[in-house]
Amino acid sequence: MSQVILDLQLACENHAGLPDEAQFQRWLDGVIPQFQEEAEVTIRLVDEAESHDLNLTYRGKDKPTNVLSFPFEAPAGIEMPLLGDLIICRQVVEQEAQEQSKPLEAHWAHMVVHGSLHLLGYDHIDDDEAEEMESLETEIMLAMGYEDPYIAEKIAE
């Protein structure tokens, strides 16, 4: 049986309207057990200032972003179930959901799925990688009862 341990950190000022720990756990459980049996993931919910600082420091991008993924790399020869950390910016997620006319809960779920896939080694730097990752995200989101997060982009093409 797979086990995903969640460490949820609420580092944003306003906690009203945030998904609860059970929702974050459900979203992680919808992704990670497909790839590995045990994992520990920290999800830290932050405000724009912290997201901006981290995005500038680690990605060279001078703005807040929706989700940042920091995979854990154990020292050679040591096996640990730590998968890594997801930093999710509340304001960016809420703004994107509104701009993209997506249900807020679905967009939160998508950020957890997207970030988890990054922790598992997936990326979207080139077109082939992006296509594979988006396909996995869509499959996982549909399995959890949400719409395809990329449906608007597919319709626009």
UniProtKB/Swiss-Prot annotation:
<feature type="binding site">
    <location>
        <position position="118"/>
    </location>
    <ligand>
        <name>Zn(2+)</name>
    </ligand>
</feature>
<keyword id="KW-0963">Cytoplasm</keyword>
<dbReference type="InterPro" id="IPR020549">
    <property type="entry name" value="YbeY_CS"/>
</dbReference>
<feature type="binding site">
    <location>
        <position position="114"/>
    </location>
    <ligand>
        <name>Zn(2+)</name>
    </ligand>
</feature>
<dbReference type="GO" id="GO:0004521">
    <property type="term" value="F:RNA endonuclease activity"/>
</dbReference>
<feature type="binding site">
    <location>
        <position position="124"/>
    </location>
    <ligand>
        <name>Zn(2+)</name>
    </ligand>
</feature>
<dbReference type="GO" id="GO:0005737">
    <property type="term" value="C:cytoplasm"/>
</dbReference>
<keyword id="KW-0862">Zinc</keyword>
<keyword id="KW-0690">Ribosome biogenesis</keyword>
<comment type="function">
    <text>Single strand-specific metallo-endoribonuclease involved in late-stage 70S ribosome quality control and in maturation of the 3' terminus of the 16S rRNA.</text>
</comment>
<keyword id="KW-0540">Nuclease</keyword>
<dbReference type="GO" id="GO:0004222">
    <property type="term" value="F:metalloendopeptidase activity"/>
</dbReference>
<keyword id="KW-0378">Hydrolase</keyword>
<keyword id="KW-0479">Metal-binding</keyword>
<protein>
    <recommendedName>
        <fullName>Endoribonuclease YbeY</fullName>
        <ecNumber>3.1.-.-</ecNumber>
    </recommendedName>
</protein>
<dbReference type="Pfam" id="PF02130">
    <property type="entry name" value="YbeY"/>
</dbReference>
<dbReference type="GO" id="GO:0008270">
    <property type="term" value="F:zinc ion binding"/>
</dbReference>
<keyword id="KW-0255">Endonuclease</keyword>
<dbReference type="InterPro" id="IPR002036">
    <property type="entry name" value="YbeY"/>
</dbReference>
<comment type="similarity">
    <text>Belongs to the endoribonuclease YbeY family.</text>
</comment>
<keyword id="KW-0698">rRNA processing</keyword>
<dbReference type="InterPro" id="IPR023091">
    <property type="entry name" value="MetalPrtase_cat_dom_sf_prd"/>
</dbReference>
<dbReference type="GO" id="GO:0006364">
    <property type="term" value="P:rRNA processing"/>
</dbReference>
